[in-house]
Amino acid sequence: MKIKTFNSEIRIPHSEFERGNNMSNEIWIFAEQQEGKVRKVAFELLSVGAEFSKKTGSQVAAILLGSGLQEAVKSLIPFADRIYLIEDPALVSYTSDAYLTNMAPFIKEHQPSILLGGATSTGKDLFPRLATHLQTGYAPDCTGLATEENGKLVAKRPLYGGKVFAEMTFSEARPQMATVRNNTFLVNQNINKSAQVISISSHTDPSSLKKKVLGLEKAAGTKLDITEAEIVVAGGRGIKAPENFKMIEELSDVLNASVGTTRATVDEGWRDQKDQIGKSGKNISAKLYMAFGISGAIHHVLGIGTCKTVVAVDTDPNALIFNYADYGIVGDLFQIIPALTEELKKAMKE
């Protein structure tokens, strides 16, 4: 693997993967599913794969594991040329050993050119294990992807807390593997493929599994993660104190929204890092994003690029956030937020 940052180049040695005659030119997307529903990031990556295929002539395949996946398969058909389906009751919920047992031999046999997945908790656990097993390179937590005509993948990811970006390329080992942050790319709804579904026999031996998921429980009273929320209300340093986020919370309750924030407030210890939006935090793709007291630094706005509508409120008429907003209000958030909250409450009672 080769990493390039600015004008310097670092070479990372790895074991060479012995390529056989079965190496394919396919682009594979790990179609992660939860409770039978394919996660949005998989459709983002299938859309990227479709763009790559125009340049490389490759076919795009989704690899899907689980049980009772009829609806998941149906949702993937327009986005891929092939769907490799591995169904087994032991794969209903993700466990690293069950997924690795099934995916690693199949990938090693077919050797796709590229394998992409979401930088989710599952992807972050599975992909390093796969890369180690396959003795190939892996670029984690990427915020950009490109490909050359010869099929070489170029993966872009932040380093040092988002202070710099690295461009990573791969040597001859295959597949070229990367995980990508949610909401990095838009989903192309106009691909209109008609995938061939290929069922693959499961290699799972339940008696050999080290872990078993007994059940899943959703935490009571918690809001959606900001990467999945349709409405996100965020506060920045302009909030002035951590206790003032109570206003943001009240507004978010009225809107049934999730609460986001900036790196500055996280560094101050005002908010949790899980709510941070930006290149060193999370990308969001909300239908409505409301930014209060956020100046609009580049490391923040990189995380809102796929939001549909952006509303910004700041006292500074020259704040950079207004360059990215569909609607901007120059004013005092301490007056605007309570007034907006009350008006919304009244409107919802009518």
Where are these regions (language model features)?
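N-terminal glycine-rich FAD/FM-binding segment characteristic of electron-transfer flavoproteins
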Residues: 19-350
